[in-house]
Amino acid sequence: MKKKVLITGGSGYLGEVVVERFLSAGYRCYVLDINPFSEKLASKVVFHNVDIRNKDLVDKACKGVDVIVHCVAQVPLAKNNQLFVSVNYEGTRNILNAAENNKCSHFIYVSSSAIYGVPDTNPVNEKTPARPCEKYGKAKLDGENLALEYASRGLNVSVFRPRTILGNGRLGIFQILFEWVYQGKNIPVFDGGKNIYQFVHSYDLAEAILLCCKKEVFGVFNVGAENYCSMHETLSGLINHAKSKSKIKSMNSSFIIPVMNLFSFLKLSPLGAYHAKLYGKSLYFDVSKIKKTLSWGSKYSNIEMIQESYDWYIQNRDDVLKGSGKSHHK
């Protein structure tokens, strides 16, 4: 019998990729999301149009489900602190309660590399101390701790900590970068862009989650591209690919970071304090644990995935700018 997998946040960018990957592997997929689900996949899943904060409806949606992949997350860019806390913490508690009550065999929590903050040394492995430096990282760490609390009571739990996610349809702050490259504007880096910055493709992350489900392996895993490079090299690869007139311009981080923080505080910028803190810093994972445990390997390099993401943006630019393309939720 095919396993039943429920993906929370399945209407979001990563959630939809996870749904597609599980469907292609023959699983019966259920989606729980407050936002409408993809029309192209609607006939292939059972969709629960439910708010993760509604405990009773969440519990009902999880009846008969074997595996839960929890992708729901409220990002701090929304600037709504009450919504941020209720979705990320209370919502996670609700889905964990439902998993426990319905005796689900496996709970997979999608966390974030933001739990590490700005690490003292690289590469970062699963034993590196978690030191989140902003709200999103703290919320993700709180979610991890909740999940591990339920694990101590007998729930089988896996936690994935992905690096910054890219892939077809990935927008958010990348829309700003892609539009600048399209228009030939200068692209700023801090202190020469020598910092090593790692991404992960949504397909590679979804593949890791699928393998974890298939192999029934539990624990914490860092996920990132195996082939990555400096920020300057990544951006150069994008600019050359786009045949853009953009130039990479180095800026003094000690001057620009306070300005970015001020703009974020005044709500004049879509960027959060975390972006200012980390943009000029190195952060990359040691992925030896996930490679060995799940026999996983990344398909995409940093440069390949940012080029692919840019190509998608250009092909869909008109719809995106009209507001009919994929939103920040994506």
Listing of model-derived features with the role each one plays in the protein:
Residues 5-25:
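N-terminal Rossmann NAD(P)H-binding glycine-rich loop of SDR-like oxidoreductase domains
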Residues 133-158:
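Active-site Tyr-X1-5-Lys
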Residues 52-89, 98, 115-118:
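NAD(P)H-binding glycine-rich loop region in Rossmannoid oxidoreductase-like domains
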Residues 215-271, 287, 307-310, 317-328:
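Mid/C-terminal beta-alpha module of Rossmann-like enzyme folds, strongest
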Residues 158-175:
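Flexible, glycine-rich beta-alpha linker
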Residues 94-135, 150:
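Conserved Rossmann-fold NAD(P)-dependent oxidoreductase catalytic core, especially the SDR/UDP-sugar
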Residues 53, 83-94, 134, 138-139, ...:
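Glycine-rich NAD(P)-binding loop of the Rossmann-fold in SDR/ketoreductase-type enzymes
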Residues 178-187, 197-232, 236-240:
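Alpha-helical substrate-binding/gating segment
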